[in-house]
Amino acid sequence: MAKGDPKKPKGKMSAYAFFVQTCREEHKKKNPEVPVNFAEFSKKCSERWKTMSSKEKAKFDEMAKADKVRYDREMKDYGPAKGGKKKKDPNAPKRPPSGFFLFCSEFRPKIKSTNPGISIGDVAKKLGEMWNNLSDGEKQPYNNKAAKLKEKYEKDVADYKSKGKFDGAKGAATKAARKKVEEEDEEEEEDEEEEDEDDDDE
């Protein structure tokens, strides 16, 4: 079950799997010399399982629950070691938003103010409909801003990686913090420019 990684925890077993395992052990004790015909054996196990009461199955259900706890615990211990490189660094540059996300950030407060008590799901639905109804030209300012932020993000990542190698995490954290402030200032300036453009359109 742990193909390619011997340290990976053994998969969790179902109640039926424990039942089959028990049947196999019983068969070995009673007929140690007789090899198991798996096709026939599986069929018999399946038929027997179907005729068992919930009370009879309870023992195997408990075994499956205990094995699930074991599996979850082992996977929790195994996960960080395997995915350690993928662990999020709080000092890393923040991933840039998409054009749609920028549009949502602008119009979400407006929808909430005009529709008091509206659910989060309905807000998302309305935003999706509004975005889909925009022409490519109307989407352009948001997509352009997203492209700029993406470009900046890629530069920040390159700086962050090089800083992390030479100056350590502390230097990277300082750099990331400074970049974040600059990015927020830039966003505010662009927001003001867009609002001015909107006013001109009106």
Swiss-Prot record:
Gene3D superfamilies attached to this UniProt entry: High mobility group box domain
Post-translational modification: Reduction/oxidation of cysteine residues Cys-23, Cys-45 and Cys-104 and a possible intramolecular disulfide bond involving Cys-23 and Cys-45 give rise to different redox forms with specific functional activities in various cellular compartments: 1- fully reduced HMGB3 (HMGB3C23hC45hC104h), 2- disulfide HMGB3 (HMGB3C23-C45C104h) and 3- sulfonyl HMGB3 (HMGB3C23soC45soC104so).
Residues found modified as Cysteine sulfonic acid (-SO3H): 23, 45, 104
Residues in the DNA-binding region annotation: 9-79, 93-161
Bias-annotated ranges (Acidic residues): 183-202
GO CC, any one term: cytoplasm
One Gene Ontology term from the biological process aspect of the record: DNA geometric change
Cell compartment(s), UniProt: Nucleus; Chromosome; Cytoplasm
Molecular function terms from GO: DNA binding, bending; four-way junction DNA binding
Disulfide-bond pairs as recorded: 23-45
Top-level taxon of the source organism: Eukaryota
InterPro entries: HMG_box_dom, HMG_box_dom_sf, HMG_boxA_CS, HMGB
Region listing for Disordered, in residue ranges: 71-98, 161-202
PROSITE patterns, per database record: HMG_BOX_1 (PS00353), HMG_BOX_2 (PS50118)
Keywords for the protein's UniProt record, in alphabetical order: Chromosome, Cytoplasm, Disulfide bond, DNA-binding, Immunity, Innate immunity, Nucleus, Oxidation, Repeat, Transcription, Transcription regulation
Function: Multifunctional protein with various roles in different cellular compartments. May act in a redox sensitive manner. Associates with chromatin and binds DNA with a preference for non-canonical DNA structures such as single-stranded DNA. Can bend DNA and enhance DNA flexibility by looping thus providing a mechanism to promote activities on various gene promoters. Binds to the delta-1 crystallin/ASL1 enhancer. Proposed to be involved in the innate immune response to nucleic acids by acting as a cytoplasmic promiscuous immunogenic DNA/RNA sensor.
UniProt xrefs under PANTHER family: HIGH MOBILITY GROUP PROTEIN B3, HIGH MOBILITY GROUP PROTEIN DSP1
Family: Belongs to the HMGB family.
Protein name in UniProt: High mobility group protein B3
Organism per entry: Gallus gallus (Chicken)
Upper taxonomic lineage: Eukaryota, Metazoa, Chordata, Craniata, Vertebrata
Chain's gene name: HMGB3
